[in-house]
A protein has these predicted regions:
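N-terminal secretory signal peptides
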Residues: 1-27, 52
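N-terminal export signals
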Residues: 23-24, 30-52
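Enrichment for repetitive, rod-forming helical segments
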Residues: 11, 35-36, 41, 108, ...
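Structured, non-membrane catalytic/scaffold regions adjacent to prosthetic-group chemistry
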Residues: 53-422
Length: 422
C-alpha cells in the first residue's frame, strides 16, 4: 500500500507547512487579534491557565468552520460537528449546515489544480493517475440523492452509555451528489479477476506518525455498483472543504465511514485489507445484525458495519413543547433505510397504543431520506406522547429498542417526544 509522504513539495496538491495552515486554516492576522488580548497578561515564562488555553483554542477553532453555520460542536480536534435537527425540515441539507466528521486532526488545504487521484494495486493491469479536470471530463457525470449518515449517529442515546463521539441525531445529512461512477473509472485500469477488495485513502492525517492512517476498503461488488460514485459536487456546488473537497467517495446505503473525504488514492487488491480501521474499528457483533454484505472481512464473531438500518426522525417538534388545543399541529419528519425504500411511516400520539399512517412526500430516490407529514387534530388537553416508526419496502420495521453493541452503532429505536396541549 502506498504510504503518504512525510513531506510534500509546494507544487503538490496539499501541504503540511504548519499546524495552523494544515488544520486550523486560520487567517494569521485574525488569530493574532483574537489571541493577543488573552496573552497580553502573561509574563514570558508564565504557564497559561486552563482558561487561557481554552481561550487560545477558541481563537483557533472559531475560524476553521467559518463556511459552516449553526453546527453543534462535539470535538475540536479532530473536528466533529453535528447538525441541529431543525435543519432536517428540507429535502436536502444545506451545505453550510451539513455535519462534519473526522478521525484525524490534520485537514490539509488542497489545491484542486494540482490534486491527483492515484489508482494502483496488485489486481489491475494499468495504474492510473487522474487530475480533477480529467475526472470531470473523461467520464460520464451522474447525480444521486443519498443520505450520508455516521455509523455512530444517536450514540448518546444508548443506555448504558458507550464510548465514542456522543452524537445526538444530527450526524447525518441528505444531499444531491454529482460525480462519476467509480466502476467507470476503475474500468480504465483493467481490473483483474483476482480482485477482491478496493481500498481508499484520503489526504487527512493524524498528529502523530503512529496514528493509523484512515483507510477503508469495499468489496468488489459494492465498488462495481452503479450508484457508488466519486463525487465532486454537493447540492449543486463544489464539495465544501469540510465535506471532502475536491473529491470524495459516495457509497449510498452504507454508513459514512466508507465515504472517504479528500480522496487521493485507490488500490484494487487481491486480498482483504488488514489495517486498523477495517480489522479493529467499525465492527459489530454478528448476533443481532444481518451478515453477508462484506464476507471477506467477516469473522466468526463480528463483521464490519455496512448497510444502514431502517429509521425515522421527527424533525419539527422538541420534547416539552406546548401547543394550543384549538388548532391542528403539523408533525414533520424523515425516514430512511439501506436503499430498499420506505413503504410507510406510522405515528402514534398515545405512546404506542394506537398507530396511524402519515403522508409520504416526494420520492427523490431509494437512497434519499423520505420526508413525511401528519396533521394532529387534538381531542383533549394534556400530554401527547408522539412516536414515529418506519417500515421499509422489504418489510423491516424499526424496533422498540436498539440492538446493543460495544461501539454504539445502528441506533434506530423508536423516538418518543412528549408535548403538552393547553
Amino acid at each position: 500500500m502506498t504510504k503518504k509522504p512525510e513531506q510534500r513539495k509546494s507544487n503538490q496538491p496539499y501541504e503540511y507547512t504548519s499546524l495552523t495552515k494544515a488544520y486550523f486554516m486560520i487567517n494569521r492576522r485574525n488569530f493574532i487579534l483574537k489571541s493577543a488580548g488573552t496573552l497580553a497578561g502573561l509574563s514570558l515564562w508564565q504557564k497559561p491557565s486552563l482558561a487561557t488555553t481554552n481561550a487560545i483554542e477558541e481563537a483557533l477553532i472559531l475560524e476553521p468552520l467559518k463556511s459552516k453555520d449553526g453546527l453543534i460542536k462535539k470535538s475540536y480536534r479532530p473536528p466533529n460537528f453535528e447538525t441541529p435537527i431543525s435543519y432536517f425540515n428540507t429535502t436536502f441539507t444545506p451545505n453550510k449546515h451539513f455535519f462534519v466528521r473526522y478521525h484525524h486532526a490534520i485537514i490539509p488545504e488542497i489545491n484542486s489544480d494540482n490534486w491527483q487521484l492515484s489508482i494502483g494495486g496488485d489486481a489491475i493491469n494499468k495504474p492510473l493517475s487522474l487530475t480533477l479536470k480529467q475526472l470531470q471530463t473523461d467520464f460520464k457525470s451522474v447525480e444521486i440523492a443519498a443520505l450520508c449518515l455516521c455509523s455512530g449517529n444517536r450514540r448518546s442515546l444508548f443506555n448504558p452509555p458507550v464510548s465514542g463521539v456522543q452524537w445526538g441525531s444530527g450526524a447525518m445529512g441528505n444531499a444531491l451528489w454529482r460525480g462519476v461512477r467509480l466502476k467507470d473509472v476503475l474500468a480504465a485500469t483493467g481490473i483483474k479477476q483476482s480482485a477482491l477488495e478496493v481500498s481508499f485513502n484520503g489526504a487527512d492525517s493524524g498528529m502523530l506518525r503512529t496514528t493509523p492512517d484512515f483507510m477503508k476498503s469495499l468489496p468488489l461488488e459494492k465498488v462495481l455498483d452503479e450508484n457508488t460514485l466519486i463525487a465532486f459536487e454537493m447540492n449543486g456546488e463544489p464539495l465544501p472543504h469540510w465535506n471532502g473537497f475536491p473529491a470524495r467517495l459516495i457509497v449510498p446505503g452504507w454508513t459514512a465511514t466508507y465515504w472517504i473525504k479528500h480522496l487521493t488514492e485507490i488500490n484494487i487488491q487481491s486480498h482483504p485489507a488488514d489495517n486498523f480501521w477495517m480489522k479493529t474499528a467499525y465492527r459489530i457483533p454478528k448476533e443481532g445484525f444481518k451478515s453477508g454484505q462484506f464476507i471477506s472481512q467477516e469473522t466468526q464473531l463480528n463483521m464490519p458495519i455496512t448497510e444502514l438500518v431502517v429509521n425515522s426522525l421527527i424533525t419539527n417538534l422538541v420534547d416539552g413543547q406546548t401547543f394550543s388545543s384549538n388548532k391542528a399541529i403539523e408533525i414533520n419528519g424523515v425516514a430512511w433505510d439501506k436503499g430498499d425504500g420506505i413503504q410507510r411511516v406510522e405515528i402514534s400520539i398515545d405512546g404506542g397504543k394506537t398507530w396511524e399512517l402519515t403522508t409520504l412526500q416526494k420520492n427523490y430516490g431509494r437512497f434519499s431520506w423520505r420526508q413525511w407529514r401528519y396533521n394532529l387534530k387534538p381531542t383533549h388537553t394534556g400530554e401527547y406522547r408522539i412516536m414515529a416508526r418506519a417500515t421499509s419496502i422489504s418489510g423491516i420495521t424499526q424496533p422498540l429498542e436498539p440492538v446493543a453493541n460495544p461501539s454504539g452503532y445502528h441506533h434506530n429505536a423508536l423516538q418518543t417526544i412528549s408535548i403538552q396541549l393547553i
